[in-house]
Every structure is written in structure tokens, then in C-alpha cells.
UniProtKB/Swiss-Prot annotation:
The lineage of its organism: Bacteria, Pseudomonadati, Campylobacterota, Epsilonproteobacteria, Campylobacterales. The active site is at C116 (proton donor). The gene is murA. This is UDP-N-acetylglucosamine 1-carboxyvinyltransferase. It is found in: Cytoplasm. Keywords: Cell cycle, Cell division, Cell shape, Cell wall biogenesis/degradation, Cytoplasm, Peptidoglycan synthesis, Pyruvate, Transferase.
Amino acid sequence: MEYLKIVGGKDISGSVEISGAKNAALPLIACTILGKNEITIGNLPNVVDINTFLKLILKLGGSFVKEENKVKINTSTINNTTATYDIVKTMRASILVLGPLLARFGHCEVSLPGGCAIGQRPVDLHLKALEQMGAKIEILQGYIKATAPNGLKGAKIVFDKVTVGGTENIVMAAALAHGVTTIINAAKEPEIVQLCEVLANSGVKIEGIGTSKIVIEGTGQKLIDIKPFDVIPDRIEAGTYMCAAAITNKKLKINKVIPLHLEAVISKLEEMNFEVLQDENSVTILPTNEIKPVNIITTEYPGFPTDMQAQFMALATQANGTSTIDERLFENRFMHVSELLRLGADIHLNGNIATINGKMGSLNGTDVMATDLRASSALVLAALVANGETNIHRIYHLDRGYENLEGKLSLIGADVKRSKED
């Protein structure tokens, strides 16, 4: 197993380039199941979760050719509609093949998901919506067994609560359904906008893209001709490097981003007294004379993303005063707190609210353990300003979602090395 060794207190400067968004790429790869042609995807991030999902496409009978950050996928040869536990257990996003497989073939079996260690994410909302579209669904021996022998039927779907994965699954299912599907209380994330735009550019009639009401006219099980596209930039990776600049209080330019997608993060950095310069496809963080405390509530897009709260918690340890973070979306999403405490942070938990008493220079390097993807990035940020050396173990979590993290950090001046455990 590998770990990261980070020596804190180094000056960072220059610029960093952001990769394609993992959370956009995963549903887009699932979407290729709806295609009749070879599909070219560019700006694909080279991270473990993407490679796992491509393996799943292979297991289903599809094929792909990958070169650096581009992949050509052909799913016309799919002859297996079972997504088995061995792959699904490592990544919850595997559930995204459920909608497209069922819509295309009229039957599929998908193992109940594993992956993230950040609380329950029940797939009930996905299943209820598919049942409203005419599917018969049973859960047997850990598998979702879904059938719709005559194809899925368009329906009015009202999600009880906003669900990103549920919206993605139903958008894809609706693309091949018979008739019109209306999704009410749809998620509005940029990743969902791109999924809808790719389908629309491929001939599927979709209205309401980027709103909470999406209307999709299905093709009646006719496969679609999916045009080539590039994955949008990763707003969470961008936000993480913005926090790297802020926590070290140095100037850093972050290239290949869509600033509109970063509005909530930019707003909170400005509240913390940082100036953020914006260009068409870059943002620059400027240092401040005082890092001010901040109060954050996580919520659905366009609000503050839950995937950024761990990084802002690390940043808040360096603020002059008391910050709060109210996690409204997931339970068990404060597992990084115990590790930040090992570094010397002053953090108190009360249910889903964390109170952080900040003080610049308060952290000291030691051994810590990553517990999930975003928690591990918080530990990296904390290590950048901790006195001495920090060893971050179980960094396979980082590799799930950050492309070449130590390489990018080294290029901007951080002292980061990857080593093997003895």
C-alpha cells in the first residue's frame, strides 16, 4: 500500500491545470450504453473510478480503446446485462448502468452498490422512479433484478428529494423509453447538464436542461448516434486547488475551469477575505492579510457542495476565529475530523455541525489515515501548512478522484512524495 509524505511550509506559486470531471465522466460512460456507434470521449480524467467503470463496460460485453485522456467506447456488442458485485462493490456509481441497461434490453441485474464510506445513499429513489416507468423490480440475494419486457414507458417522476444519481439514471432511461418523461425536482448539477446536452446533441428531445423540471421524449428503444464530446472540467478538483492556494496564503492560477461552476466556492473564499480573479476559463487566488472565519451550509447545486466541505474545514483551521460547517446532505461525512485533530486542529462536533476554532500555524505533522476521497484531500491541504512532515496513509481513496495529485502539487512548489509502506 502507498502513502504520501508531505513536508509543510513550502511556498506554492504558478499555475495548475484542472482535469476532466470524474463525476461527469461516470454517467457519460454509462450513457454510451444507449449508443449504436463507437463513441469518442475527450478530456477524460485518468483516475481509478474511471478505469473501474470502463472495466464494467468490458464485463458487459462492450469494448474500449484508451489513449491518455481520450477513450473510444463501443457498446453495440454488449451481450450481458448483469453488473456483478466484484465491480459494483468498489464504486457506487456502477448503479448508473441500471437505467440505460433496462431501457435498452428490457431486463438487467445490478448488484446493490458499495464504494463510498460516507453514509447511506439508498437507491430507493432510482427504483421507485423506474417502477413508475413500468419496470418490475425485485431485490434478491443482493442484486436489483429489473424487467420491462416491452420497454420503459414515459411517466411523470417526482423525486421526494433531490438526487444526482437518480436524476442521471432516469434521464438515461427516459432517453430510450416509449413516450414522454417529466422529471420534477431534478438535480441541476453541471454534470447533469452535460449529460442532457450530450443526449440532446445526439438527437434526443430534451427540454428544461439545467432546471428542476426536465422533459424528455424517448426514442422507443431506438439506439442513438452519440456525437464525440469532451468532459467538462472538474469543479471539485478546481475547488481543492483553490483551497491549496488559500490555506498556504499564496497566489495561484487555476486553469481550464468554468468559473460559473465555482460560484459557491468563490463566494466563500471571498467571505474569508481572499480576492478571486476570474477569466473565461481560469481563476486566480490572491493572498490576504487575514484569513477570516466562515459559516458554511452544504446543499444541492448551485449551493455549496458537500464535496468541498472537508477542504474548507482544513482551510478554517488557519482562519482567525471560529467557523462552522453544517453538513445537510450526508451523514457520516465528518470522518476526517479525527485525523485533523491528530494534526492539532481544534474542532468540535455536534451532530451534523462542526465548529472549527482556527489559528494560523496551529497544525503539526504526524501520521494520518484517509477515510474517503474528499476527506483525504482535506488531509493533504492540512499537511501543506503543518509544521514538519505528515504521512497520509490509504491514499487509494485519493487516486479514485484526483489525477496526478502529487505531480500537480510538486509543480507548484509543494514537497510531496509517494512512497510504499514497509
